[in-house]
Swiss-Prot record:
SUPFAM superfamilies membership: SGNH hydrolase (SSF52266)
Protein name: GDSL esterase/lipase At5g03820
Keywords: Glycoprotein, Hydrolase, Lipid degradation, Lipid metabolism, Secreted, Signal
Active site as annotated: S37, D329, H332
MF terms in GO: lipase activity
Lineage: Eukaryota, Viridiplantae, Streptophyta, Embryophyta, Tracheophyta
A UniProt-annotated Pfam family: Lipase_GDSL
């Protein structure tokens, strides 16, 4: 019965998709992306930060084999999402030279690797804070309004899907390695602390005219190769770190509850919480059944901790075929895994495109 429901929902999405494609128009007027390295398409390239991915072997399986700044060997889940929605190009990184003129009319990408709900996370790594991403979005709105006028611009903003994917850096690159935060907050208390900036962010987006917002849950933090290496049991690199996964589950529960309250209090808002925890956990725990060979080690280098500048052309041991791997580097999914995640997002996101 469960499989039948999934198939029925998938068929509905496909039917809806082809209906939109048949008109030559995407299903929504624009796609706005905000968050961290999981969805950063190159904004960090222009920052003075170590958290970058604009060099080989990143991007080796992307279009023209270019390292665009995406933290993967190829496409991000949001790239697949843009394709499925009927867009013929991906949202341009807002800090890039391409972010001008009519290129902005179908959306933009404001995400920055190492950003988080807590602005302190981004500040520590010299990334773009979520508050600054929102300021950049306001600037973007002014540019679009100048191009097409207020009436059409407002329709673009209200009809656009706004995707937010962040939070992992708050835990993996801040809380777990910061003794001060560890001493002040339990993981549960830290999750509570992050709900306020999340609520404020959604409220601010809503005030700017956004009516379709999607936010991703945390992934199974304890199954990321770098997390297993850094926080797992000594000598045991084959098991997810359960306490980290439990922290993610707790956070995700709070995220769902907070999102429900926001939906109830903001008239006309469609807010969808995208579950990426379970699809990625399924791939990590059952790689072969999902078409993968390896889920404990990443493709890049030794597959244990390498990410960003540690994952480079000189990294010894990088795999030859990333499609066999769930993870490209120590923190980020491969293109093949991103495709699976995107397929799940499409089914879950029906309320945002209907």
């Amino acid at each position: 019965m469960k499989m039948f429901i999934i198939m029925l929902m998938t068929f509905s999405v496909i039917a809806c998709f082809y209906a939109g494609v048949g008109t030559g128009e995407p299903l929504v007027p624009a796609l706005i992306i905000m968050g961290d390295s999981v969805v950063d398409a190159g904004n960090n390239n222009r920052l003075n930060t170590l958290i970058k991915a604009n060099f080989p072997p990143y991007g080796r399986d992307f279009l023209a084999h270019n390292a665009t700044g995406r933290f993967s060997n190829g496409k991000l889940a949001t790239d697949f999402t843009a394709e499925s929605l009927g867009f013929t190009s991906y949202p341009v990184p807002y800090l890039s030279q391409e972010a001008n003129g009519t290129n902005l009319l179908t959306g933009a990408n404001f995400a920055s690797g190492a950003s988080g709900y807590d602005d302190g996370t981004a500040i520590f790594y010299n990334a773009i804070t979520l508050n600054q991403q929102l300021k950049n979005y306001k600037e973007y709105q002014n540019k679009v309004t100048n191009i097409v006028g207020s009436e059409r611009a407002n329709k673009i903003f209200s009809g656009a899907i706004h995707l937010l994917s962040t939070g992992s850096s708050d835990f993996l690159q801040s809380y777990y390695i910061n003794p001060i935060l560890n001493r002040i907050f339990t993981p549960d208390q830290y999750s509570d602390r992050l709900m306020k900036p999340y609520s404020t962010f959604v409220q601010n987006l809503y005030d700017l005219g956004a009516r379709k917002i999607g936010v991703t849950t945390l992934p199974p933090l304890g199954c990321l190769p770098a997390a297993i290496t850094l926080f797992g049991e000594t000598g045991n690199n084959n098991t997810c770190v359960e306490r980290l996964n439990q922290d993610a589950v707790s956070f995700n529960t709070k995220l769902n509850n907070t999102s429900m309250n926001l939906t109830n209090n903001l008239p006309g808002l469609k807010l969808v919480v995208f579950d990426i925890y379970n699809p990625l956990l399924n791939m990590a725990m059952n790689p072969v059944e999902n078409g993968f060979f390896e889920s404990r080690r990443a493709c890049c280098g030794t597959g244990t901790v390498e990410t960003s500048f540690l994952c480079n052309a000189r990294s010894v041991g990088t795999c030859s075929n990333a499609t066999n791997y769930v993870f490209w580097d120590g923190f980020h999914p491969s293109e093949a895994a991103n495709r699976v995640i995107a397929n799940n997002l499409l089914v879950q996101g029906i309320p945002l495109i209907s």
